[in-house]
């Protein structure tokens, strides 16, 4: 049974459009404006419909798909939190991850880490690190549903912004 709010009304089309667009950040923003316009301009006599409209007005911020970002350093991503990161990547959820790869444990004063390249000298690795750098990007790509970009923040800020936009748009 259809709710009286949408039965044979233009709202039915608007709500269907939202259902089709709710998983896209850009599309859900566009369609949510139409939903908000429709509910704010509606006048209904049914008490249940009025209550529903008021609840939708209170929660209108939830109509737009949220962008979710996890931001951390390489010590977390490559080592301490890798199990959790791997779990999130394997889940298939639409989550973006930004890893600041300094190639050392920055919080410990520069010790070599799993992100330190082979032969690099660091604290407690004065003769150079013996093992090669863990390839986190390749490991993430093995899931097949992950967008990976590697950028040099100091080299080209436009490339960084482009990668962030591409990550956000990737489904």
Listing of model-derived features with the role each one plays in the protein:
Residues 1-48, 52-55:
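N-terminal leader/propeptide and maturation segments of large enzyme subunits in energy/redox metabolism
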Residues 89-135, 145-147:
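Active-site cavity-forming subdomains of large catalytic enzyme subunits
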Residues 4-5, 62-64, 119-169:
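Conserved thiamine diphosphate
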Residues 43-46, 72-73, 114, 122-124, ...:
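Short linear motifs at secondary-structure transitions and domain/linker junctions
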Residues 47-107, 111, 155-170:
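Thiamine diphosphate
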Residues 46-49, 54, 66, 114-118, ...:
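A generic structural signal for ordered alpha-helices
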Residues 13, 17, 37, 58, ...:
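Charged/polar, solvent-exposed surface patches and flexible loops
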């Amino acid at each position: 049974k259809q709710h009286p709010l949408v039965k044979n009304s233009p709202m039915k089309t608007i709500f269907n459009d939202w259902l089709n667009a709710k998983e896209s950040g850009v599309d859900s923003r566009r369609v949510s404006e139409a939903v908000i316009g429709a509910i704010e301009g509606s006048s209904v006599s049914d008490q249940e419909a009025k209550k529903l409209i008021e609840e939708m007005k209170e929660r209108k911020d939830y109509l737009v798909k949220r962008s979710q970002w996890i931001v951390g350093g390489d010590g977390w991503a490559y080592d301490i939190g890798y199990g959790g990161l791997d779990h999130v990547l394997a889940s298939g959820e639409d989550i973006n991850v930004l890893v600041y790869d300094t190639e050392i444990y920055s919080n410990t004063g520069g010790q070599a880490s799993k992100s330190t390249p082979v032969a690099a000298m660091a604290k407690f690795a004065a003769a150079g690190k013996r093992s090669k750098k863990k390839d986190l990007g390749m490991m993430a790509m093995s899931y097949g549903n992950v967008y990976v970009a590697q950028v040099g923040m100091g080299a080209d800020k436009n490339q960084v912004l482009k990668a962030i936009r591409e990550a956000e748009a990737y489904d």
